[in-house]
Amino acid sequence: MEMKQINETTLKIMITMEDLEEHGMELKDFLIPQEKTEEFFYTVMDELDLPDNFKNSGMLSFRVTPRKDRVDVFVNKSDLKEALDFNDLSDMEDYSGLSPEEFLKALEDNFMDKGDIEAHHKLEEHDKTLKEVDETMTEPAKEVAEETIREDYTHYVLAFSDFDQVVTFAQGLKNVSVEGSEFYKLGDVYYMTILLYLADEPDYYANNMYARFLEYANVADRTRPYLQEHATILMEEDALPVLQATKWS
């Protein structure tokens, strides 16, 4: 493993396939938010000699970029103390009875409570650096990454013009089960990432599901890595089932 400091708030860790294997990790492990992935990230950081300003810091965010012969992990340091956990809303009297607008405001207020406004604005300042980092990923590397995950999984990014459209999407797909889903807000637009497991499904399954999604959602103009770094994440896992199970007033 090798580490390079891009600037005071961003590290780049280069992990070989052999390193992944030694730690019991596979590329597909990075597609689904889980404790195993988070533990791996912090194990790697413990093994490396981190710069002093990254030790005992606030919240760290991670982004994975697959390469042909390695995985690049970009570690971003912020002043936030912790990330939003949907379980934090458990102390609300009855969020299932909220209107869509009230539900959304509760999510956003909960997120902003995790750190001061200045800290959140600092996250946006990483835009230029992360954009330059994105441009270092060559087309062949992207193709390798796509081929790697295409066998068992596929993911989509969907856009919604307002929260009412999100609610309609969730209600219209109440019988649909997905492997993973995340919910973001960027500007006035809402985004949802959907991860589908394809190994046990017929060849046409992915196309059919995408067509169903687009009955209620729009094609997104942002990628998941972009949203991870630039958007406000409202629900970082199980977004679709949570919205499906919510009763709107």
From Swiss-Prot:
One of its GO terms (molecular function) is protein-macromolecule adaptor activity. Pfam families: MecA (PF05389). It comes from the Bacteria. The N-terminal domain probably binds unfolded/aggregated proteins; the C-terminal domain interacts with ClpC. Belongs to the MecA family. Homodimer. Enables the recognition and targeting of unfolded and aggregated proteins to the ClpC protease or to other proteins involved in proteolysis. This is Adapter protein MecA. It comes from Streptococcus thermophilus (strain CNRZ 1066). The gene is mecA.
